[in-house]
Amino acid sequence: MQALINNVTHSFTSIFGYAPTHFIQAPGRVNLIGEHTDYNDGFVLPCAIDYQMVVAAAKRDDNLIRVIAVDYQNAQDQFSLEHPIEFLPNKMWANYIRGVIHFLQQAKYVFQGMDIAITGNVPQGAGLSSSAALEVAIGQTVKTLYQLPISQKEIALNGQKAENQFVGCNCGIMDQLISACGEESHALLIDCRSLATTAVKMPESAVVMIINSNKKRGLVDSEYNTRRQQCEEAAKILNVTALRDATLAQLQAKKALMNDKVYRRARHVITENERTLQAAEALKQGDLTKLSELMAQSHISMRDDFEITVNEVDTLVEIVKSVIGSQGGVRMTGGGFGGCVVALVTPDLVAKVTQAVEAQYKKQTGLKETIYVCSASQGAGYLEITNGIK
């Protein structure tokens, strides 16, 4: 974190010519269990991770917004709050910021201009929600600078709106909500229908490992939309608002009315919701054996019923599983078709898992993995800088 603060301060000071007054952070996230349940009004169990976006900021006394993207060679954007905020097709990173500010304005929050510089170490394209962290960081920055009466939940919803309607990417609410509302040493059980959140204490004996398969994610959008349609079709046949409301018994009773794919997609969602609720309970009890079982079932369900895993990801899961047995859990995390696996393991197994993956993964797939060892972290907020800038 200190390196990020130093970096962002250096860019801010050298380009704007004065020192920032505030620092804000917003974390990335990993979803421990509850995959493709969010748009079915179901449950998810993510935690915020100690990889984050950091913003250095200061108020202006006019209506100008000036932005520096430190990680894009200090690229800059500038726009006025007095004119309609436009989408920039040739500067994608800037649209996340423009979108957040546009919707804050639309919600009638009152604020003026600001100078901001942004940096981060949330890996991009790994499915760890760097875009949601950016949206939440900007919302949090405006809230902090201008003491806006906006809740963390509203910051999350505003970020989601920016991504869906301004940037033009479909996403559920989980990523923004965990970035805005995460708690240190806790996962967050989120009800994606009511947006109610319950903090679930992580066992001290559990370390979060994220292993990126580095398999480029192809077909994500088209396959995501197909899965979504299949889930909606199943809900219609079952005569429920969303698959969150269906039981396995209801699904079995209507099996003859749906094709096999639609049936299996629905079976994944219904069982995954149940697993997610059980996993929250197991986590609370510190029952890693039960968690191991639930995460294994989740992966099999994603592989066989939802069909969103790929060989490289399945290979990683098998390698990790062979090391940890029932002393932790492992499964694919994220939208699918590549991306990362998440493992919850005891501290003594981190080195063994790392060794096994480094020795076997490339040999079996031709790809080199990237490993992140994380801990469940605090959601977005103001950073008190007590030790000065180094």
Curated annotation (Swiss-Prot):
Originating organism: Proteus mirabilis (strain HI4320)
Q: Describe the reaction catalysed, as an equation.
A: alpha-D-galactose + ATP = alpha-D-galactose 1-phosphate + ADP + H(+)
Q: Do you know which InterPro entries this protein is assigned to?
A: Galactokinase, Galactokinase_bac, Galactokinase_CS, GalKase_N, GHMP_kinase_C_dom, GHMP_kinase_C_sf, GHMP_kinase_N_dom, GHMP_knse_ATP-bd_CS
Name the site position(s) for Transition state stabilizer: 29
Q: What name does the UniProt record give this protein?
A: Galactokinase
Q: Which residues bind substrate?
A: 35-38, 224
> What family classification does the UniProt entry report for this protein?
Belongs to the GHMP kinase family. GalK subfamily.
Annotated ATP binding sites: 125-131
Cellular component, GO annotation: cytosol
Could you tell me which PANTHER family the record lists for this protein? GALACTOKINASE-RELATED (PTHR10457:SF7), MEVALONATE KINASE/GALACTOKINASE (PTHR10457)
The metabolic or biological pathway listed in the UniProt record of this protein is: Carbohydrate metabolism; galactose metabolism
